[in-house]
Amino acid sequence: MEKQLIRFDWAIKKILRQKENFVILEGFLSELLKEDITIIEILESESNKENEKRKLNRVDILAKDNKESYIVFEIQVTKELDYLSRILFGVSKIISERLNRSAKYEEVKKVYSINIVYFDMGHGVDYVYRGTTNFYGLHKNDKLELNEQQKKLYDYERIEEIFPEYYILKVDSFDDNTKDNLDEWIYFLKNEKVKDTFSARGLREAEEKLNVLKMKEEERRKYDRYLDELRYEASMVDSSYGIGRIEERLEIAKNLLKNGVPIDVISASTGLSIEEIIALK
């Protein structure tokens, strides 16, 4: 019988930052990247510190692996039209913040951007997309390759290995038909359940650690409240309270304030900051 498990976004916020639970993230990454990944630490920055004022629909975490690569996980629940731009900004910020001013450019670390989205982002029939950087000749259409000195310098064989690597998992586009271990993980991300036949790395640990029935009473109440807030926000996006111009969102916030809606809920629903909403009073 399939157990009801905790949503992955909540798990990242509350559970998977603990070292004893790294095995779950390591399993997911190993299946996605098709290589053995070991996480050595979770890094804190202004973007991923615990903050109750943050938008409910976005969760992120920054990790560092045994190869000193940076891995940023981001889970986006509701629609965001400029999401691709935010992915680019996030990766650029990690690179600039983590490189010492006196460091050589060759010391720039590899960054993996893992994006789990629960909305229909762009046109495409697949549910897992990978983005890399390569250079092709405008006249000969040949692919630029590293020479032997560069391979030794970077310790990479291909140019694309130097640049950030992007993954987008469109969870809601998955048809629940599992064909490999990565599909088993996506099934879990979509349904919060693990089938007895699944064998993907990290899923058995996820089944054990993320069992809803094993949550303490206070923790369960907070989790249920989180789910309620997500459902409320989703309903707001589906209605006229969705993404719009800043003037429209300000007007919506004013109306919600008049009707006694809590400021944090207004912030989550409109994308406005707490300070912007307080200024409307």
Question: Over which residues does each language-model region extend?
Answer:
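Short, hydrophobic/amphipathic alpha-helical patches that form generic packing surfaces
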Residues: W10-K14, I168-V171, E184-F188
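Short, charged alpha-helical interaction segments and adjacent helix-coil junctions
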Residues: E2, N66, I71-Q76, S173, ...
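Accessory alpha/beta interaction modules
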Residues: M1-E165, D175
